[in-house]
């Protein structure tokens, strides 16, 4: 019987890189993992990081490097770099360590599952029809060159008394093919009748396996 699994975790260290790059012994591992989660939760709540597609955390000799992948780098950097400096100061206060912040621009936001999911969530919160938001997202993703896309929403859709799920799919989205580069993300829309969950799968084509050097020590590295 087939089981549901996360496409990203399923392919981590095979065709996808880890989102946390560090080594921790038995005493440090739990501490580092909790710290990573706190860093990510903190950044997700910052207005300047609302257009962020993801965060990568690296550790080296007592320092932390956080790479913010975003479609709006100017918003994260701020006027004359003021926002980045503010983030550094707040992260240092949160972790007690020196934190370096790098900004990486997402060149094609239409092909990023997290940005697509967030976009659908924002439309639903603005009372746009969930079907219209889903179909518009599918069209923009396919127009951008994806081989396939699937979007699913769950909850009290359109204020219905009974929660249900609806999904739309266009193209090919293989879930068991490891070499398939599947970008997957989730988001939630807070509405007056409850929370609507959104899931997005995007097939970006086939991808070669990640070189062993890129995931050495993967067993001791957390992908939070």
UniProtKB/Swiss-Prot annotation:
Keyword set, alphabetical order: Ribonucleoprotein, Ribosomal protein, RNA-binding, rRNA-binding
UniProt KW Nucleotidyltransferase keyword: no
Molecular function via GO: mRNA binding; rRNA binding; structural constituent of ribosome
GO cellular component: a single term: cytosolic small ribosomal subunit
CDD domains: KH-II_30S_S3
Subunit structure: Part of the 30S ribosomal subunit. Forms a tight complex with proteins S10 and S14.
Function: Binds the lower part of the 30S subunit head. Binds mRNA in the 70S ribosome, positioning it for translation.
Family: Belongs to the universal ribosomal protein uS3 family.
Name of the protein in its database record: Small ribosomal subunit protein uS3
Organism: Chlamydia muridarum (strain MoPn / Nigg)
């Amino acid at each position: 019987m087939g089981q549901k699994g996360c496409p990203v975790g399923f392919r981590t260290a095979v065709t996808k890189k880890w989102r946390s790059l560090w080594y921790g012994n038995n005493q440090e591992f739990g501490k580092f993992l909790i710290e990573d989660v706190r860093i990510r939760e903190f950044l997700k709540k910052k207005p300047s990081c609302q257009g962020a597609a993801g965060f990568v955390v690296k550790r080296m000799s007592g320092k932390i490097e956080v790479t913010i992948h975003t479609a709006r780098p100017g918003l994260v950097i701020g006027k004359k770099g003021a926002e980045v400096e503010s983030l550094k100061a707040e992260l240092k206060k949160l972790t007690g360590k020196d934190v370096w912040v790098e900004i990486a621009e997402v060149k094609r936001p239409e092909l990023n599952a997290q940005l697509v999911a967030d976009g659908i969530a924002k439309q639903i919160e603005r009372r746009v029809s969930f079907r219209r938001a889903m179909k518009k997202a599918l069209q923009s993703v396919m127009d951008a060159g994806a081989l396939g896309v699937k979007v699913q929403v769950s909850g009290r859709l359109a204020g219905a008394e009974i929660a249900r799920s609806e999904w739309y799919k266009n193209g090919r989205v293989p879930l068991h093919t490891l070499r398939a580069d599947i970008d997957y993300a989730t988001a939630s829309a807070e509405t007056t009748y409850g929370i609507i969950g959104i899931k997005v799968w995007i097939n970006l084509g086939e991808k070669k396996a990640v070189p062993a050097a890129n995931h050495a020590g993967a067993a001791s590295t957390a992908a939070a």
